């Protein structure tokens, strides 16, 4: 089987984005456009991925430092052919070279596999699409059904401008063929650029067969040159993700108001309300309910978990039949055991909450271990930070913590203890003790409220 290498063109500035960020780093579903293309290339088992970079190269390399790509500098942006010329020294004669674009993130491996399979042994295959309005695109010129050339919009004559089949820019040929044709490119055109599309005419001249494969989905080959186009790609991507989940049995109340910015696995009878955002790696058990406006990132939810509206969870694990929210925030390192309850306006960070325990409202729990069947009263704060270091609070099983309590870490409250409301706990509490630290109540008779003078 012939090996495959992929070239991704990613040197453009993206002037119409009006941004300091290189165009290909603008995100679709929370991931840079070019990263989508790299991931697709990986699905094709490419031997090597050559990434052509230019504008914003330092930032591009920084953001993609973990990617297994060969960085190829295009110091001057003199056209697509010029970009390919920079990568040509790395091409092996006997491998196939697939050319992709870093700002066209929705191309699928399935479509590219069809294109690669259609490539003649001695020839080139290119991906085309038919548009109702082809303005701005290179036109496919055919003679007797065969592709003989591609003419760019600015170089096309009036008759050629009527053609609706356009070039997507995606093509595949052997390394030897590309090297031969790239060495013969010139910039004798209206733009003064080196067009990769000129290799089609060269292939015909040399007697090579040119095979065209029509993409069936326009959005798959669409690029994003401005933020309006970027938003259109985002909406299409999210539509596809929602449809996949719906067909797999997930209820999404309004697919147009759902965003998936990562991957999700799920059980049966999951219900997702409107304006929910799922990021990173999400695992949902059976009968999970996620309320409106909630944001989940890298979260595991067990069976029968309910996330009530407008809750934010990150890097957290929620046990079966637990519930969270509304308006709760679970920060990284939070683990809730089965049947735990976290109510409104509660923030938890790097803490475990035991089975059946309740943190009802208006509470901060940080760097803590809380046992089973504990009740944390409203307004409780674990004071875990002294301005320099973090300290731990440990609460045993069956503890009752009254409202408006401050637990000054490091501190341990043993099982069965009761903390009276309004207490500030600075020392360890033994099992089954009652601790009250508030000032005794005083009654002042005959007191007069002050009046305005």
Curated annotation (Swiss-Prot):
Keywords: Acyltransferase, Cell shape, Cell wall biogenesis/degradation, Cytoplasm, Magnesium, Metal-binding, Multifunctional enzyme, Nucleotidyltransferase, Peptidoglycan synthesis, Repeat, Transferase. InterPro entries: Bifunctional_GlmU (IPR005882), GlmU-like (IPR050065), GlmU_C_LbH (IPR038009), Hexapep (IPR001451), Hexapep_transf_CS (IPR018357), MobA-like_NTP_Trfase (IPR025877), Nucleotide-diphossugar_trans (IPR029044), Trimer_LpxA-like_sf (IPR011004). Residues 249-453 are annotated as: N-acetyltransferase. Acetyl-CoA binds at residues 378, 384-385, 403, 421, 438. GO terms for biological process: cell morphogenesis; cell wall organization; lipid A biosynthetic process; peptidoglycan biosynthetic process; regulation of cell shape; UDP-N-acetylglucosamine biosynthetic process. Pathway: Nucleotide-sugar biosynthesis; UDP-N-acetyl-alpha-D-glucosamine biosynthesis; N-acetyl-alpha-D-glucosamine 1-phosphate from alpha-D-glucosamine 6-phosphate (route II): step 2/2; Nucleotide-sugar biosynthesis; UDP-N-acetyl-alpha-D-glucosamine biosynthesis; UDP-N-acetyl-alpha-D-glucosamine from N-acetyl-alpha-D-glucosamine 1-phosphate: step 1/1; Bacterial outer membrane biogenesis; LPS lipid A biosynthesis. The active site is at 361 (proton acceptor). HAMAP family: GlmU. This is Bifunctional protein GlmU.
């Amino acid at each position: 089987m012939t090996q495959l290498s992929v070239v991704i063109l990613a040197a453009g500035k993206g002037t119409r984005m009006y941004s300091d960020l290189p165009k290909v780093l603008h995100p679709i579903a929370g991931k840079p456009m070019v990263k989508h293309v790299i991931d697709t290339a990986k699905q094709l088992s490419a031997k090597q991925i050559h990434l052509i970079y230019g504008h914003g190269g330092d930032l591009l390399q920084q953001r993609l430092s973990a990617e297994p790509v060969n960085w190829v500098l295009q110091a001057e942006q003199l056209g697509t052919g010029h970009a390919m010329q920079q990568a040509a020294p790395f091409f092996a004669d006997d491998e196939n070279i697939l050319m992709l674009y870093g700002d066209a993130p929705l191309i699928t491996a399935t479509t590219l596999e069809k294109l690669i399979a259609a490539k003649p042994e001695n020839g080139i295959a290119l991906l085309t699409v038919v548009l109702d309005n082809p303005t701005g695109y290179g036109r496919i010129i055919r003679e007797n059904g065969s592709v003989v050339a591609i003419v760019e919009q600015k170089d096309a004559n009036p008759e050629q401008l009527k053609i609706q089949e356009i070039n997507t820019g995606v093509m595949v040929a052997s390394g030897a063929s590309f090297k031969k044709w790239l060495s013969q490119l010139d910039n004798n055109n209206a733009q003064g650029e080196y067009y990769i599309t000129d290799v089609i005419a060269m292939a015909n001249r040399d007697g090579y067969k040119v095979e065209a494969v029509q993409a069936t989905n326009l959005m798959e080959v669409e690029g994003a040159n401005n933020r309006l186009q970027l938003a259109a790609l985002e909406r299409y991507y999210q539509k596809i993700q929602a449809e996949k989940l719906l067909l797999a049995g997930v209820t999404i109340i309004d697919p147009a108001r759902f965003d998936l910015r990562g991957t999700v696995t799920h059980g049966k009878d999951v219900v997702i309300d409107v304006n929910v955002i799922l990021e990173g790696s999400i695992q949902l058990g059976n009968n999970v309910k996620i309320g409106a406006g909630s944001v989940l990132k890298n979260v595991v939810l067990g069976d029968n978990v309910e996330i009530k509206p407008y809750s934010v969870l990150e890097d957290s694990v929620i046990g079966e039949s637990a519930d969270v929210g509304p308006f709760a925030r679970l920060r990284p390192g939070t683990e809730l055991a089965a049947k735990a309850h976290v109510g409104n306006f509660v923030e938890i960070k790097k803490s475990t909450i035991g089975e059946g325990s309740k943190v009802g409202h208006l509470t901060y729990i940080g760097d803590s271990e809380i046992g089973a069947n504990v009740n944390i009263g409203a307004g409780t704060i674990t004071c875990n930070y002294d301005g320099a270091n973090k300290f731990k609070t440990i609460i045993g099983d069956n503890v009752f913590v009254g409202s408006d309590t401050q637990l000054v870490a490091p501190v341990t409250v043993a099982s069965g203890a009761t903390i009276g409301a309004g207490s500030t706990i600075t020392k360890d509490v033994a099992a089954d003790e009652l601790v009250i630290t508030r000032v005794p109540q005083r009654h002042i008779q005959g007191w007069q409220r002050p009046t305005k003078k």
